[in-house]
Regions:
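...captures the hydrophobic TM-helix bundle architecture rather than a specific catalytic motif
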Residues: 1-239
Length: 239
C-alpha cells in the first residue's frame, strides 16, 4: 500500500523526461507487492487461518464513537491481496507495450499505482469507515482511468457516466454506514472495528427481534449495502 502510494508521487518528475522509466518502476514495485502478498497468504495458511491484525490507531473521536485506522489480515484478505496485486501486475506489464508512445505514458502509470494502492487499502481495512474512504478513492481512480484520454468525447462521456452511477450506489452505502455509526451501541456496543459481515447479519436481525429497531430499517440498510455492491461493476472495468 505504502509503496504504491509513494510510486504514484515519485514518478511525477518522469512526466516530461524519461517517461519510460515510470512503467518499469511501477512494475517492479507491484512485482514486489505480489511476492509479499504470496508470502502473507502462506503465513496465514501456516498459522491455521488465524486472523492477523495490528493495534488500530485512533484517527477521529466523535462522541462515544472512535474512528480508527488499522490493518486486518485474515484468510479472505490474504487471498484478495494476491488477486489484486496479481491482476494489477499483469495489467501493468501489458500496459508497458500497449501505452508505448503515448504522450501521457507516465501519468497512466501514476494513476495505476494509486488505483492499486486504493484497492489494497480497501482489502486490508479494519473498519467500515476506513473501508468507505478507500472505496471512494477507488472510485476516483476509476474515473481518472476511464477518462484517461479525456480529449476523446467517448472517454469523457464514459467517465462521467461511471462517476454518476457509482455515486448513486455509494450514497446508499453511506446511508447504511451512518445508521450503523449512530446506532453503534445497539449493534456492537459502540465497536465498529469489525468487517465481519456475519456480525452485521447477526446483529441486525437480533436487534429487530428485540424490538430495538423496526424490520423496515433492516430492509433499508440491506438495500443500501446491496446498491453499493451493484455499483461496483463499472469500477472493475477500468482494471
Amino acid at each position: 500500500l505504502t509503496s504504491s502510494l509513494a510510486i504514484a508521487v515519485i514518478i511525477r518528475p518522469f512526466y516530461n523526461r524519461h517517461a519510460k522509466l515510470a512503467g518499469h518502476i511501477t512494475v517492479s514495485t507491484i512485482s514486489a507487492a505480489f511476492v509479499l502478498s504470496l508470502w502473507t497468504l502462506c503465513s496465514v495458511i501456516q498459522n491455521g487461518g488465524t486472523t492477523i491484525g495490528w493495534e488500530p490507531i485512533s484517527w477521529l473521536q466523535v462522541g462515544n464513537i472512535s474512528i480508527t485506522v488499522g490493518i486486518l489480515l485474515d484468510p479472505l484478505t490474504a487471498i484478495m491481496l494476491v488477486i489484486v496485486t496479481g491482476v494489477s501486475l499483469m495489467v501493468q506489464i501489458y500496459s508497458i507495450g500497449y501505452m508505448q508512445g503515448d504522450k501521457s505514458y507516465a501519468r497512466y502509470f501514476s494513476y495505476m499505482s494509486l488505483f492499486t494502492a486504493s484497492m489494497v487499502g480497501l482489502v486490508i481495512s479494519s473498519n467500515i469507515i476506513q473501508l468507505y474512504l478507500f472505496w471512494e478513492l477507488v472510485g476516483l481512480c476509476s474515473y481518472l482511468l476511464i477518462g484517461f484520454w479525456y480529449h476523446r468525447p467517448s472517454a469523457a462521456t464514459a467517465a462521467k457516466k461511471a462517476f454518476i452511477v457509482t455515486r448513486l450506489g455509494d450514497f446508499g452505502f453511506l446511508l447504511a454506514i451512518l445508521y450503523l455509526v449512530f446506532n453503534a451501541d445497539i449493534f456492537a456496543g459502540g465497536d465498529l472495528n469489525s468487517l465481519d459481515i456475519s456480525v452485521i447479519n447477526t446483529a441486525l436481525p437480533n436487534a429487530a427481534k428485540a424490538g430495538l429497531i423496526g424490520t423496515s430499517v433492516v430492509t433499508w440498510i440491506s438495500i443500501g449495502i446491496f446498491n453499493w455492491f451493484q455499483s461496483k461493476e463499472p469500477r472493475y472495468a477500468s482494471l
